[in-house]
Amino acid sequence: MVMTDPIADFLTRVRNANTVYHDKVEAPASNVKKAIAEILKQEGYIKDYESVEDGKQGIIRLYLKYGANKQRVITGLKRISKPGLRVYAKKDQIPRVLGGLGIAIVSTSKGIMTDKQARQSGLGGEVICYVW
């Protein structure tokens, strides 16, 4: 079966694993997914991630993070720009997620970055997803 939106599949795997309190989640690797995982790690939403070579595409493995009493660190993940409806934002129209409590992951001409980094760099781009 051909996957039409690999990023949405990746986010859904993370969301589902987070819902049932799994310690780790695996997905087929790509450079975009690695960049998203790096942002999630920098922002403190996951413990760590690693890329595992399997002779084909490779696998990206994320180690999920939970607070005291199994409180989820990631409370929500939402795909914004989809293959059927791309969503772009100019540098002065980059959205704030929950008034700054969450992050928007934006694909810019300088790479994939958070909404805050894009605002500081004065760059717009495709809004990939929201994380809160």
Swiss-Prot record:
Q: Which UniProt keywords apply?
A: Ribonucleoprotein, Ribosomal protein, RNA-binding, rRNA-binding
Q: Which GO terms describe its cellular component?
A: ribonucleoprotein complex; ribosome
Q: Name one GO molecular function term.
A: rRNA binding
One Pfam family name from the record?
Ribosomal_S8
What positions belong to coiled-coil segments? none
Enumerate the Gene Ontology biological process terms: translation
NCBIfam families per record: PRK00136.1
Record's subunit section: Part of the 30S ribosomal subunit. Contacts proteins S5 and S12.
State the family it belongs to: Belongs to the universal ribosomal protein uS8 family.
Write out the function statement from the record.
One of the primary rRNA binding proteins, it binds directly to 16S rRNA central domain where it helps coordinate assembly of the platform of the 30S subunit.
Give the protein name, as stated in the record. Answer: Small ribosomal subunit protein uS8
